[in-house]
Amino acid sequence: MSQSNSHGQSNLAKFAFNIYGTLSTNSSTPQSHEISPSSSLSSSRSKKQTSQYNTQDTNNNRLSYYCDKEIISLSQLNCSLSIGGYSGDLQHHVVIGGKNYLRLLCVSESQQRIISGINLLESKSIYNSRAPNKLINVNTIKTFADTIATGLSNGVVSIYKISPNGQSKVTGKYSDHNRTINSLDFIESENQLLSGSQDGTIKLWDLRSSSTKPVMTVQANLHSDPIRACQYSPHSAVRNKICVLSVHDSGALCKFDLRTKSGGKVYSPEKKWNLHTGPALSLHIHPEKELVVTGGRDKRISIFNYGERQSRNTPQNLINTYGPVVKVRWSTYTNTEETAEEFEENKQAKPNTLYNYDIACSYLNDDPTITIYNLGRKFIPKQIIHSKKPIQNFIWARNETRSRKIWTISKSSTFSSYNLDRLEDSDVSRPIEDLNNIAMTWNNNNDFCAVSQARYDYDLETYENGINETTEENFDAERNYSLGNEELIHSQANSLTASPVDKPQLTRSLTFNPASSFSTFSPVLVARAATGFLQNDSATSSSSIPNMQVSSSRPKLTRNTSQTTQDSSSSQFASVLPPPSASQTYSSPQYKKNNPPRFMNNPAYVIPVSIPIPANDEYVFRKLSSESLVSTPDGFTLVDVCLLNASVAASVGNNRTSQIWRLLAVSIQEEFESGIEPRRIYAFQPEAINKLPQDVQETSTNANDTLHAETTNSNFVESFKSTSTSGSQFGKQSDKDERKLQSKNSSGNLMDMINKANRTNSFSATSFKFKEQERKEDESQKAQSIKDENERASIHSKSAPISISSHPEDLDDENMGSNNSAALKFSPPSVGVSIPSTRIISSSLASSPKSVRGPSGVKSHISRSRPSPPVQTWLKQKNLEVSNGSAMASTSGLSLTLKRNKTNEEGDQLTKAWKFKSLLRKSLDYATLQGDIIFCSTAALLFYDIVPEIISQFECLEWLGIYIEVLQRKRLFVNAINVIKCATADIQEKLQKLYCQDLSLRFYCSNCQALLVNEKSKFSGKGEFGYWYCDECSKLQSQCVYCNEPCKGLAVTVGLKCGHHGHFGCLKEWFIEDQNTECPGGCGYQII
């Protein structure tokens, strides 16, 4: 409990020091701690603690060291030390600092093993005091030769000297800052030191002086703008200047000249640039040029030229990262050495020094990665270091082999070393290796572009360098050679003939390459004859062409011939240059060995393709996305919404989508509103066949017997038609006549029902689940009664004689389809004896045999005449087989089809295939395959809350996410917000996190182009603060064209052509009250 309290008090103390600083600032002596004057090497207690808490891991040749306390700062000491018991000469060492922790780790020559650890807090010190030891928080460390400078959280600067034998002592302590020291840097030697603090000041210390006061104090503004990092620029010394750069919490980069005549204090920088919208947290100066890299909380890395001759106020290069950047560093060594493995085509150092050095950065928010970028391809990280714990700090390490090594410390108090040149390190990923050489994407106009680029062919030289190296004679020789090829092609055009079967492949004749207009020409067409390439000898190779760079052209882009290009005359032309073979590609070592190196690398080329797709019409998309209902308005039901969406789809010609919406509306109304219980189709009962009659009656005199004969005959004929969907009719003859009349006036199919859907009986979305639950409860209660009724009907039908009509069927009946549909809707299922489809029965009234598979519905006429002898013979034989048990009667085709769709073979119930849920699922599956994102998203918004078992949450989020992205890409922001508003609560919460984020707007001065921060006015409190003026140039940004007063807040623009704007009230008075039609600015622009 006491340990947790002490830990919380230490965190509170650090937080208080960062905000308020020390309470007493008059004391010139340090008050942080007291160090006993005992040697660190001779202390046995230090060695015991080192062996007890510190361990090192050399697995996979990686240096690792665990510290027993929290560490936050890291640096490298480059001086020669001789440690007792070790014969080697140690040059590079690690300095780690943290809470009550400051240790020097002596590393071996190979940097794979730690030889010794020196506790610098136990160094000899001349600053003795009787005060007890207090909290020491080493926030930053900087080294120069054998000197180590540390910046503490209480504003004290401590200086340590390391002797050649490894002993250390404190040589000075300076305290003039009020808050935490964030940055330290030496100026050309170990005698002058810069310190930047959270109190907004930069102080220059002379370490040779006995005074503990700074030589100079520099401040960016009169108010306190905390300094996150500062560094001395060695490139400005040639102009007799002491240039210092600093970054602040305001996001500004300031440049100071310490050789000023203003005395010991400077309150304004020489130059100031606003590079970041949020706090700038780190900076580092380029090793060779006047370039500085800065990183900030706005997730950006800026590369800026701070030289005297530059006049721009914006960064020269900008890298967008995936997190707030807390530390950014240029690499120590160039990339020339490592190009032999990764970048095989670049054997020489590139003339642009920006590409010779990599940039590494770490992130806030407990991110466990360090990303390495190169400006040659700044959009894709070159390498990423993955750690198990969040990265606290890192540096580029110097070493004897000049390899690219990074030293890191993590929040788990672990020091680690990573060699970026080792391919075996699993913790260092290379994203470029996981990418394809060819990529494509769609734009808003339904066109797409394909980009092709070599994997490591990214570090492009400047166009000017390529032009200077290529002389005019080379261009003339290449141009003459190209013209000669064209004449040869035209001369061979008449002699070249190709068969319709073997046509030469079409090749890419021109691609969009920005560098082609400067140094190279388009690749020459390469075509093949009927059996292959044109016969060319080696004399036509690049060796016979004077001063021609063959490798400067990219490989050809071919495609297979199509039917539309068989007669193309352009495909008959051929080139005299054959393409490289598969064994000699542009990336193979053999090809590079036999050809001279290129003077300029091939940039990526873009292939734009425009394909007019009718389904992606812009007007159709806007119409459907704007007018389709995604929610149920007041007074409407789901049926009404479906019908309205159907009309919207029909208005733009999407007839299939329109019919799907109508089908859903009818299925909803029929299944859940009509009050008729859904019918169930039961499995065939084999035991019912045992009760079939053994003989067949010829006629019947009773009216009821006649009715039964008609019914049985209908079932018998329907069983003949295995592929038909019709059935028999039960009821009176008057009912049959009435239905017969209805079938003449209407087709009776499902589409007529859809077109005549009634809204009066529609239901609301809230009653959907209740009615569905009520229907399911009634199903189980009436299942047994329906089953008994079917059994009675099946048994009763076999007690009556069967009469076969001798009247021929009307196969050309126009109402045949409608009768079948009506029969399916109103007739219960029946059991009959099916005759094989190959049997042909002769009719007594027909001159030719007719197939028994003719349609027989409500229009079928059943005769009481005697059936024909073949039929009677077959029936007797069939009944005899059934009665003897030698054969079982087969079920009808409809029954077989329904039985195949059953999930249980034990006779379970079968539901209708046109149920609402089934139709909805099938419609969504089809729309997903077709890419109809509008239908999927609209259906998800309407039915997700009602039928969650049909539409999963993952599908709903995926469809709506893609739909919102498409809407935003097409600038339909109102429709996108409406989609988010109409989603359910759980879906809406997740969509808002992704697509409803706050925007950060950056405003620049219209006169000096500086970023409008107005820090002076913000803290001075004079006047009304805003962004309608600029502190840098002291000019107003916009004035009303009518009253000539500043436009604070909302302003109305007269027209985009003239650009004049003013207050809303002023322009209302000018145009509406005074009824003027011209712009009040006098430009003559007419608004009407």
Curated annotation (Swiss-Prot):
**What Gene Ontology cellular component terms go with this record?**
cytosol; GATOR2 complex; vacuolar membrane
SMART domains on file: WD40
Hey, what's the signal peptide range on this chain? none
Keyword annotations for this protein? Metal-binding, Repeat, Vacuole, WD repeat, Zinc, Zinc-finger
What coarse category fits the chief subcellular location reported for this protein?
Answer: other
Zinc finger extent (RING-type)? 1040-1083
- A Pfam family hit: zf-RING_16
Which molecular function term from Gene Ontology is one that the record holds?
zinc ion binding
Q: Which GO terms describe its biological process?
A: positive regulation of macroautophagy; positive regulation of TORC1 signaling
Q: What is the role of this chain?
A: May be involved in a process influencing telomere capping.
This protein is called Restriction of telomere capping protein 1
Q: Where does this protein come from, organism-wise?
A: Candida albicans (strain WO-1)
Phylogenetic placement of the source organism = Eukaryota, Fungi, Dikarya, Ascomycota, Saccharomycotina
